[in-house]
UniProtKB/Swiss-Prot annotation:
It is found in: Cytoplasm. CDD domains: HSR1_MMR1. Residues 1-26, 607-640 are annotated as: Disordered. It comes from Saccharomyces cerevisiae (strain ATCC 204508 / S288c) (Baker's yeast). This is Large subunit GTPase 1. Belongs to the TRAFAC class YlqF/YawG GTPase family. LSG1 subfamily. One of its GO terms (cellular component) is cytosolic large ribosomal subunit. The gene is LSG1.
Length: 640
């Protein structure tokens, strides 16, 4: 009997059914964005019960401590409004436009070109009259009963008032150039903490221009916070100065009753490395032997002129600080004398701390502003060092190029390089630049539009770039921006050395250009050259029969590196590198020479093209009525 239903067709099994599990990853992109918005836009209730809502981004602490020294007009307006807690509403039909108002500064002065002695004297007199208005922001008085919001609001109001005072100073004196200064309140808060905590505030300045890096109002602020606190001016990089220059600066500081000392963090760190290498054979007097010179001066001045060693600097700190710490110690901790180190970026605060501690405790960089936050380092059982981030204090300068040459503004972010390079060419003698780099700078006379013996910025940069082979795309174009970065970094690092003299002791007037040249003439001698360059110049001098080398007199005759010497009738020249791109030549003549070089002939057109008569030029398409006697183009082939 047949089955009631037909058997089902066999099918392959599909396998087990998938089990859907819930995703364990709760932090998806959507949820992450949602949580971030909730955290940023959180509602805060003030102590009086008022609701406070903000849309400010929640940023990390290191982002808030970024240094801000320059702002555009719009950024400055918005930051000032944010400090004042101003509200904004959008006005779609507003016709207000934002324009940039040029300051009244002379373009030559602001960009960094040379100034006459009379112009410099007039500006300096006005700067000294307004120096009392160059203030640093004070932290307002506070107590433990204040809430976080009240303290923050009070600090912002005081900081905003300080910004307004400096803005009024700049607007009312348009002929003065105010240096870029720190505009981030979070960075100034680090200074406030250092001043409150420290018993001795050490202001570190660059020995090449101490008055630019010194803030007089900071010393007043330290005394205002507590009269028992002490100030000390640490003149770092003193090894770059000759003893004659240190004597001049010591006399000036003593006449102004400024507590100061000379120090060299670089030399101290080098001696630490030498001490590790020599071990027990190391002699302490090695530090002093390099500094012994014969000078007759007052005993008090000579004692101050000496560059201190590490141990002597530690003893000086302890002698200048109060005998007992001003702040009470924390429970269970011994009392510590706190020594705060403050100053501009790139003056050597971190290097000074590393030399004192004897090991690399703080990161060091050639870029200004490496230290980002307030740090404490224990020097001994009774001394604590406080390292403050680099702060650019408000001050007066003659031009923007001076700020770049002093290392205040970073060179890698520089756009206008002509002004700073012009200052270097003006301050460093031409023969010494040629000896340092082994090049020859070709200058134009004043009749030809040049500066005579003083090269212009373009002449210096072109000579350096062509000697090094720094060229832009194309033929015969020197890469001047790249050359300027190398030269300016050598100037900031002290390879090209220039020291600003102190003002006159009688009336505080600045030195003239001729007096500055006399003050620095001992820096541009043969013995100051690097060892490798000194050996090259000495060998070249021996080949010419010169025993005692005078760079100003003999350099034009010597041949070394890329500098090819001349004689009394022939000027020296510089060897260029980089092939065709590093040589000046006419591209058209070079093309003709290469083309006709095959048959050793030149091709010249006897008649210009526009004078060749073509009778068929008026006929359309040149198809009919062709003249049988049409003149042909005649080329004359002449032997070379």
């Amino acid at each position: 009997m047949p089955p009631k239903e037909a058997p089902k067709k066999w099918k392959a099994p599909k396998g087990p059914k998938p089990t859907h599990r819930k995703n364990k990853n709760k932090l998806e992109l959507g949820r992450a964005i949602k949580y971030a918005r909730q955290k940023e836009n959180a509602i805060e209730y003030l102590p009086d019960g008022e609701m406070r809502f903000t849309t400010d981004k929640h940023e990390a602490n290191w982002v808030k401590l970024r240094s801000v020294t320059q702002e555009s007009a719009l950024d400055e307006f918005l930051s000032t409004a944010a400090l004042a807690d101003k509200d904004f509403t959008a006005d779609r039909h507003s016709n207000v436009k934002i324009i940039r108002m040029d300051s009244g500064n002379d373009s030559a002065t602001s960009q960094g070109f040379s100034m006459t002695n009379e112009q410099r004297g007039n500006l300096n007199a006005k700067q000294r009259a307004l120096a009392k208005d160059l203030i640093v922001p004070r932290r307002p008085e506070w107590n433990e009963g204040m809430s976080k919001f009240q303290l923050d609001r009070q600090e912002k109001e005081a900081f905003l008032e300080w910004r307004r005072k400096l803005a009024h100073l700049q607007e009312s004196n348009e002929d003065l150039l105010l240096t870029p200064f720190e505009r981030n309140i979070e960075v100034w808060k680090q200074l406030w903490r250092v001043v409150e905590r420290s018993d001795l505030v050490v202001q570190i300045v660059d020995a090449r221009n101490p008055l630019l890096f010194r803030s007089v109002d900071l010393e007043r602020y330290v005394k205002e916070s507590d009269d028992r606190k002490a100030n000390l001016l640490l003149v770092n990089k003193a090894d770059l100065l000759t003893k004659k220059q240190r004597i001049a600066w010591a006399k000036y500081f003593i006449s102004k009753n400024i507590s100061f000392t000379f120090y060299s963090a670089l030399r101290a760190n080098q001696l630490l490395e030498k001490q590790k290498e020599m071990g027990e054979d190391y002699r302490e007097q090695d530090f002093e032997e390099a500094d012994k010179e014969g000078f007759d001066a007052d005993e008090k001045v000579m004692e101050k002129v000496k560059i201190l060693s590490i141990d002597q600097l530690e003893e000086l700190f302890l002698s200048k600080a109060p005998n007992e710490p001003l702040l009470p110690p924390l429970p269970g901790q011994p009392p510590l004398i706190n020594i705060g180190l403050v100053g501009y970026p790139n003056v050597g605060k971190s290097s000074t701390i590393n030399s004192l501690v004897g090991a690399k405790k703080v990161s060091v960089s050639s870029t200004p502003g490496k230290t980002k936050h307030f740090q404490t380092i224990k020097l001994s059982d009774s001394v604590m060092l406080c390292d403050c981030p680099g702060l650019v204090f408000p001050n007066f300068a003659y031009n923007k190029g001076e700020l770049v040459c002093n290392g205040v503004l970073p060179i890698d972010q520089l756009r206008d390089y002509i002004g700073p390079a012009g200052l270097v060419a003006e301050r460093i003698p031409k023969y010494y630049i040629e000896a340092i780099y082994g090049i020859h700078i070709q200058t134009k006379s004043r009749d030809e539009g040049g500066n005579g013996d003083i090269p212009t910025a373009q002449e210096l940069l072109v000579a350096y770039a062509r000697a090094r082979g720094y060229m832009t795309q194309g033929y015969g174009s020197a890469d001047e921006p790249r050359a300027s970065r190398y030269i300016l970094k050598d100037y900031v690092n002290g390879k090209l050395l220039y020291v600003n003299p102190p003002p006159h002791l009688e009336d505080d007037t600045p030195y003239t250009r001729e007096e500055c040249e006399e003050f620095n003439k001992d820096l541009y001698v043969f013995d100051r050259l690097p060892d490798t360059r000194k050996e090259q110049v000495q060998n070249a001098a021996k080949a010419k029969g010169i025993d005692i080398v005078d760079l100003a007199r003999d350099l034009n005759q010597l041949t070394f590196s890329a500098h090819t010497g001349g004689d009394t009738q022939k000027e020296a020249k510089s060897v260029t590198h980089g092939g065709k791109q590093a040589a000046l030549y006419n591209a058209a003549e070079d093309l003709d020479r290469d083309f006709f070089k095959m048959n050793n002939v030149e091709g010249r057109l006897s008649t210009p093209f526009h004078k060749v008569q073509n009778s068929s030029a008026g006929k359309r398409h040149n198809k009919k009525n062709k003249s049988k006697n049409a003149k042909s183009k005649v080329f004359s082939i002449e032997n070379n």
